[in-house]
Design a protein with these regions (language model features):
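Short, positively charged and aromatic/hydrophobic N-terminal segments
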Residues: 40, 48, 52-55, 61
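ATP-dependent NMP and nucleoside kinases share a basic, alpha-helical "lid"
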Residues: 150-227
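Small-molecule kinase domains that catalyze NTP-dependent phosphoryl transfer to phosphate-bearing small molecules
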Residues: 134-136, 179-185, 196-198, 202, ...
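Hydrophobic anchor at the beta1->P-loop junction of P-loop NTPases
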Residues: 72
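N-terminal phosphate/diphosphate-binding loop that engages ATP/GTP or pyrophosphate donors
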Residues: 90-154
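Hydrophobic positions on the alpha1 helix immediately C-terminal to the Walker A/P-loop
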Residues: 83
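Conserved lysine of the Walker
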Residues: 80
């Protein structure tokens, strides 16, 4: 399995034009490469004859022959995104950060001034949203109605906005097919809150990644400092505990460990050790499935 993935140009490879998956108001499945030209047909498939384009088609054909999907769930600040992104790059898989998608909807609700806890109000703005997820130079970026909001959705206040809107069945239904389509067409590492329990219940490997609230708050503080954002530690810890409570107790798709998920607790280990552990678990399962 490993040999095959190394010989395929991943969909997010820097040598490829950005892959995009739009949802919402526009039905046009199109992506824009660095030259500004559209290279995606109405089914969302990349077309063309360059080496990179042939690589993308090969990746799709490989997906049809052998499916391998990794579902990673866990609480806020557990390191899901950073670890999953690095593991995906190491193993030649497509990384999908579903939390970024919900953050984008949360940002839209905040900008429009709607009551984020009112499902009817939030559902009313969904048809107006066109959300695109693009891979540019190996990084996932989020676009809201054509605007790059990748940085804005990482602001601390957007975390609770995402938690609020993700509690609504209308929002989860709105985004569910997009997530499943990505997994159908690619070998993915997808992280979120309900990937192994709802989105990809048949995933080849499920992992529940967690750490203590205090450890997660420490890590979040370092991220914020690196971004030049000032926020008291006590406030960061309170937000994490509040987010946990809300995510675990919502009626729709609550955060929980799937029965067949591998539990990985990173409280006492650093990022590099966590990466080696997680990557080892995934590689072992990939080889077993080959």
């Amino acid at each position: 399995m490993k040999r095959k993935t190394e010989n395929v140009v991943p969909p997010y490879s820097p040598m490829c034009a950005p892959w995009t998956s739009p949802i919402g108001g526009s039905k046009e499945r199109a992506g824009i490469d660095r030259s500004g030209k559209s290279h995606y047909n109405t089914e969302g498939y990349f077309v063309g004859n360059s080496a990179a384009e042939r690589g993308l088609r090969s990746a799709r054909e490989e997906k049809k022959m052998k499916s391998f999907d990794v579902a990673i769930d866990g609480p806020s600040g557990a390191g899901k995104s950073s670890l999953a992104r690095r593991c995906a790059a190491e193993l030649g898989l497509l990384y999908v950060d579903t939390g970024a998608i919900y953050r984008t909807v949360g940002l839209a609700a905040l900008r429009r001034g709607v009551d984020r806890k009112d499902e009817t109000a939030v559902a009313a703005i969904l048809p107006e949203l066109e959300i695109q997820m693009a891979y540019e130079d190996g990084e996932q970026r989020m676009y809201l109605n054509g605007e790059d909001v990748s940085r804005e959705i990482r602001m601390p206040e957007i975390s609770m906005c995402a938690s609020d809107v993700s509690a609504h069945a209308a929002v989860r239904s709105f985004l569910l097919e997009m997530q499943r389509k990505l997994a159908r067409e690619n070998c993915v590492i997808m992280d979120g809150r309900d990937i192994g329990t709802v989105v990809l219940p048949e995933a080849k490997l499920k992992i529940y990644l967690t750490a203590s609230p205090e450890a997660r708050a420490d890590r979040r503080m370092k991220e914020l400092v690196a971004k030049g954002v000032e926020q008291p530690y006590e406030e960061v810890l309170r937000d994490i505990i509040q987010r946990d409570e809300q995510d675990m107790n919502r009626e729709v798709a609550p955060l929980r460990q799937a029965e067949d998920a591998v539990l990985v607790d990173t409280t006492e280990i650093d990022f590099d050790e966590s990466f080696r552990l997680l990557c080892g678990i995934i590689r072992e399962r990939m080889e077993a499935e080959a």
